[in-house]
Amino acid sequence: MSIANDISPTNESAATTDLTIEGIDEPVVLRYFETMNAGEYETTAALFGDTGTIQPPFEQPIEGKEAIANYLEAEAKGMQLSPKEGIAESLDNDQTQIQVIGKVQTSLFGVNVSWIFLLSAEREILHTRIKLLASPQELLSLRR
């Protein structure tokens, strides 16, 4: 699978929704959730910089658009992301950190999640860390 160079993070897709996240109006973050929920993983990966990374729970970071698209295609099918609210913070070098909390629903379970995005000055995703917001007991019950 290769990521088309002409996929722009701002391209509108047929699956564009009226997604809103309280406290967040950053288009690239909104597109991340829209494209993930639409199963458009190559388009999601195109939102990342060339050396961008995504770090799923309990895993090492996955680097690069193609690797991210392949990972999402294998692991994210059927997930429904429901971001609720977030906060944005300006950092040095014109970077922005955005934290969003919400829920991920799979066919088997739902879990509260935090997404932490680091955006470049060019509004590309440099890094996304996904954290489960569950107690150890809740995590153990997911295995049953």
Regions found by a protein language model. Give the residues of each.
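Selective for proline/serine-rich intrinsically disordered segments
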Residues: I7, D25, I54-Q55, L81
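Short, solvent-exposed secondary-structure junction/capping segments
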Residues: F33-N37, F48-Q60
